[in-house]
Swiss-Prot record:
Pfam families in alphabetical order: Toxin_3
Compartment annotation: Secreted
Name of the featured protein: Putative beta-neurotoxin RjAa17f
Tree of life domain: Eukaryota
Signal peptide stretch: 1-18
Family: Belongs to the long (4 C-C) scorpion toxin superfamily. Sodium channel inhibitor family. Beta subfamily.
Organism: Rhopalurus junceus (Caribbean blue scorpion)
Length: 83
């Protein structure tokens, strides 16, 4: 019985994922950053209170985690950057 409860609980946890992505500036572009810069955390939390952020080094752009599902983030297939 305990194993059955454990399996059901495991399946429920697998489906729990938070949205992540690059926040956009006013011009629709990704927000540039430098490594070890706190601007990303500040930018992410200014838009979405419960989120966190860091500078993603390969692209040198801010990246936000723990976003709500309706959060608008930069999307490669729909680039709106006017920069």
């Amino acid at each position: 019985m305990k194993i059955l409860i454990f399996i059901i609980a495991s399946f429920m946890l697998i489906g729990v994922e938070c949205k992540e992505g690059y926040p956009m500036g006013r011009n629709g572009c990704k927000i540039p950053c430098a490594i070890n810069d706190n601007i990303c955390k500040t930018e992410c939390q200014a838009k979405w209170k419960q989120s966190d952020g860091y500078c993603y080094s390969p692209g040198m752009s801010c990246y936000c985690t723990n976003l709500p599902e309706d959060a608008e983030v930069w999307d490669f297939s729909n680039i709106k950057c006017r920069g």
